[in-house]
Structures are given as structure tokens and as C-alpha cells.
Regions:
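Basic, Gly/Ser/Thr-rich N-terminal segments that form RNA-phosphate-binding interfaces in CRISPR RAMP
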Residues: 1-189
């Protein structure tokens, strides 16, 4: 409802090689987190139902944005409450795509899965084509998407941030902050 309102940018956290010390301003705003040791391996499944091929392509792009195996090996994402402090960096590897016939769910006791992993690239391509047709957005050249891909492919921001000490603002500093530069300007691309 404010005519002067403008977006100040995207919320993201720099990937760091070392954890950052917390800026303890007030005990009322502190949160405790439990940190897992490095190099933990987890296995999981995502079950989907009634997705169009394009919607499934979007889900697959969200899980692994790069199509080439070499680039997919360097992708990392950040999850959890520890992101601001350099924790929570994960890699999603070995994606397998299995499909079941929905009719079998109601006619058979043992529903058979069909491995369609080899179709992942074409399913992603179907989503990218639909994105272009319906919204005029080219996945490969859109600024927001390419900025996101740059962050996903960045191992850590140490090279980009240099030796400066980057800390997070205190609550009082948020009120009059200026918009940040575009991520590409900081990364230098």
C-alpha cells in the first residue's frame, strides 16, 4: 500500500569456507542450533503425484539446476537455520526418477516402478520450453535465473569477498540500509 515501496533485493547468504561468529546483540533474539559434523550423507525420496511434465521439470530444475554431470558435481545449496553463519551447505547427487502407473495403485498389490532417470534432461527441457512459451522467460539467459545458478555453482564466496570482514547487520542497522548491488556485480561477471 506504500507508493514508495521498492524491493531491496533477494535474500541469500554467502557460502563461506569457515563459520561466522554470531553478533550477539540481545539474548531475546538468539537462537540455538544443533550442528551436524561435516560430510554427512543422507538419502531421501520425494514422492510426487499428478504433476504435468513441465511441473516435474521445474521440480527437477530446483533439485539440480545444471544439466551437465560435470557442472552438477559442483552444485551446492544451503538449508537450515545455520545458513547465515556458514552452515547447511549440501549437494544433491544421484537423482533417480521413478514412475508408477497410477491405475496400478488401485488394481495391484505390488505396484511396479519404471526407472525413467534417462528422461530427466528432456523433462527439464520441456519445462524450459513452456517457461519461454507462456511467460517469455528464457531459462538460459534470464538475469534472475542466471544469478541463482551462479550462486548454486559457487563453492564459497571467500574469493569474491576478499579479506574484508563481512558481518550481519544488527537489528537497528536494518532500518536505514541501502539496497545491495546486484549479485553479478559483486561476483564480477
Amino acid at each position: 500500500n506504500d507508493k514508495n515501496l521498492r524491493l531491496r533485493g533477494y535474500k541469500f547468504y554467502w557460502k563461506r569456507s569457515d563459520s561466522v561468529k554470531q553478533n550477539i546483540e540481545s539474548k531475546n533474539t538468539n537462537t540455538s542450533i544443533a550442528v551436524l559434523p561435516k560430510n554427512q550423507v543422507f538419502e531421501g525420496s520425494i514422492y510426487y503425484e499428478n504433476l504435468s511434465e513441465e511441473e516435474l521439470g521445474l521440480l527437477l530444475c530446483a533439485l539440480q539446476v545444471n544439466d551437465s554431470p560435470e557442472k552438477a558435481d559442483i552444485e551446492t545449496y544451503q538449508i537450515g537455520n545455520g545458513k547465515p553463519y556458514g552452515y547447511g551447505k549440501i549437494a544433491i547427487k544421484n537423482i533417480r526418477l521413478m514412475q508408477i502407473d497410477p491405475k496400478q495403485r488401485f488394481t495391484c498389490l505390488n505396484v511396479e516402478e519404471t526407472d525413467i532417470t534417462e528422461r530427466i534432461a528432456s523433462i527439464k527441457a520441456s519445462y524450459k520450453k513452456k517457461l519461454k512459451e507462456c511467460y517469455g522467460i528464457d531459462f538460459e539467459s534470464d538475469n534472475s535465473i542466471s544469478t541463482y545458478i551462479d550462486f548454486v555453482n559457487m563453492d564459497n564466496a571467500d574469493d569474491y569477498l576478499g579479506t574484508h570482514e563481512y558481518t550481519y547487520m544488527t537489528l537497528k542497522e536494518y532500518t536505514n540500509r541501502c539496497p545491495l548491488p546486484l549479485a553479478k556485480a559483486v561476483i564480477g561477471k
